[in-house]
Structure formats: C-alpha cells, structure tokens
C-alpha cells in the first residue's frame, strides 16, 4: 500500500491552501533575488531623497524652526535593516508543498507582525535525523552551531538616525516574507543527532544533511518503494565547501511554530557488527562513562569506575535498559516546544504510563492533532508491512519524527537511515520477533504497535 505524499492534513506537492480566506502567503525568495530587490529599492530611495533635499532645506529656518503655515515634517522613521550573509547557489529541485491549513490560523487581535524584529533565512531546515557512528556519542544533542551557515538573511529594527545621514544608514525597505531564523527554529535538529550535520540549502523547502553512503543508498531505494510517502523526499547529492550533502525535504516547511518530538524506534540502537568489532577492538569512552554516572552513579561496574570509562555498546545497552527501548521497542529522545525550548530529559522514561504522560503534555489537549498522529501511525504501519525495502533491511537507530502546530496540522515521518543495513540475499525480518544475537531482528514493528496502542489509549481519555 502506497501512502499519499504527506500526513493527514498535509497538501500534496504543488502548493497549499492559505491559512485563511484572503490571506495569501508571500512567495519565498532566494538570497540572489533579495539582493536584486535590495539594490533596486536602494536606488529608488536614493533618487527620492536627492529630489526631496532642496525642499527640506528651504523649509527650515536657521535654528531648525519650521516657518508658520508649513506642515511640520514627520520624524524620521525607524527603518528595518537587512543583513545578507554569503549567498549559496540556488538548487534546482522543486520543494514539496507545505501542509494544508485545515482551519483559520490568524495572528492574535491587535498584533502586527511588522512591529516585531524579524529574521529571515533562505531556507527552512528540518530534522531528518543523523546517523551515529561507532566512535561517535549517541547523545551529542541540541547543537545550534549550524545557525552560522551561509545563506542566512536577518531583518532587524534599524536605528533612528538623523535626516542628514538617514539615507546612508538605510539598508532596505523591501517587503519580504517572514521565515523563522535557523538558530531559533532549528536548534532542535540535533535532538538525536550529531553536531554540524545540517546546513541551509539556499532553497525554501529543502535542507542539506552531511552525506553518508549508507543513508544515501537507503534514501535512493526508498524513493522507489512503498515507503516513499513516509520519509523525507530525497533530491540527490550536492557539493558544498568540498563536502557532499544529501538534499532532503524540509519537514517543517508549512508549519507555524512547530512542536517536534523525536522517537527512536527499535529494541536496540547498535548493529550486531558493532558488538563484534567492539569485542575485537574495545575502545573506552570517558564521555559515556560521565553520562552514565550523571544518570546513575551505581550503574558502572567496579572495573568501569577504576577505568573511568565504558565502551559504546556497554553504554548503549545500559541506556536502552533504563529507557523504554527494551520493554516497549521505542524511546523518546527529545521534544522541542513551540516557544523554542527543548528537552532531552527522557533517559529514564520507561513505563507505558510515563510515555503516555509525555505525549499528553506534547499534544497539549489538541484532540485533532492526536487523531491525525494516530491515523498517520496506522498508515505507516500498514505500509511497512508491505514494503519490500523494510522486509529486507535491518533498521537500526531510525526515528519517527512527530511535528504539529497550533493550526492543528500534524505529520509523522521515518527519518535517519545511516545505520539501516541490507540483509544477506534471501533473508527477511519480521521486525516483531525478540532479538537474539545473530537473528538481526530490530523490533521496529513491536515498537510501533506499542506506540499506536499508547496513543489510542490517550485518545480514549
């Protein structure tokens, strides 16, 4: 069964209905287009200023008094300033359409988006996960270092300058669509990933993620599989600054102040071959020992205390044991709320009731969002059960990404395929059988069954 191109309530590529009748979204522009608008506007403003200078000088007396009978000139306005960083080239693929707006979603009465300082970025960026390598920490979270990526645009309140140098200070007065800033909106992209994995694409609706060959392999095959509508659209590989990046669909595009939850699926987050390599060439990790100690000082063994270090498989097995991974087949990695605050304090969230309370807090009583999440998860499960890709791959370290906003839009996607591995010819997985070393079962469907059951229980309350 092939899913539609997006979650329940999401429009197909090609455009979306406006949030409210008569309220149309301004088109997004690239940095190059913004610069052309900027130069044209500055030229027009400079010409107008030059033409108006004689009248302004003739209208004033010595001492700055305005003659009787002449209208007093209004004070110099506060002009927005536009700061454009280095431009990235446009990327040709067309981005998918934003989610469909099912209900009106207007600003609060009396508010004006023009009164607030604004920031613009040439591209929205979404979390499509990040593959974790054996020598990398599982918990390198919440990095916003990519906020300094090239191709960002910032619109801020300008200075109140005098008439003499007013036109020298102006940067632009171009009317531009407002897009959330990279740093504020996308600090959560590292909820379960690694620092520096993401980059602004320079095209709205797309994100660049540092390329790994296993993930490129998986995404290319997923685009031809029944699961295509359940994963971020893949638009190939591009080069930036000498590095290769995957060009992916921005899963936040079209959401207004999105809330995001990352749920890591499966009963384990390490490959069987990682266990083998770790036994053959064990490497001690002091950083993981410290993380273990911070959660439970009694968790390390006497030998680990003496070494003040643990191996990564040991840490990951311990972490999965204290979370819901081993018991429910999934665990909550992190949540980003609409106000931008992030939380990853879910390491010991283990029972069904604890998980239910987390989701209850996440949806904030929005029954429509909960219904959409539940329907989407059921669609994903139906598709996984008929997917040839899924039957023939060990899916490790992958997540389900939940996204919704205050307009009742909601979506769920499978993300992060850096550790998804093809099985030997002829072997298939059930994805529900218990894992024993050697059978390569990952427990993905076991976790999805439990997740659907928990959300169904929440919907009945």
Curated annotation (Swiss-Prot):
Expressed in brain. InterPro entries: IPK, IPK_sf. Residues 1-133 are annotated as: Required for cytoskeleton location. ATP binds at residues 197, 209, 249-251, 262, 336, 416. One of its GO terms (cellular component) is dendritic spine. Residues 1-29, 49-160 are annotated as: Disordered. It catalyses: 1D-myo-inositol 1,4,5-trisphosphate + ATP = 1D-myo-inositol 1,3,4,5-tetrakisphosphate + ADP + H(+). GO terms for biological process: actin cytoskeleton organization; cellular response to calcium ion; dendritic spine maintenance; inositol metabolic process; inositol phosphate biosynthetic process; modification of postsynaptic actin cytoskeleton; phosphatidylinositol phosphate biosynthetic process; positive regulation of dendritic spine morphogenesis. Belongs to the inositol phosphokinase (IPK) family. Catalyzes the phosphorylation of 1D-myo-inositol 1,4,5-trisphosphate (InsP3) into 1D-myo-inositol 1,3,4,5-tetrakisphosphate and participates to the regulation of calcium homeostasis. This is Inositol-trisphosphate 3-kinase A.
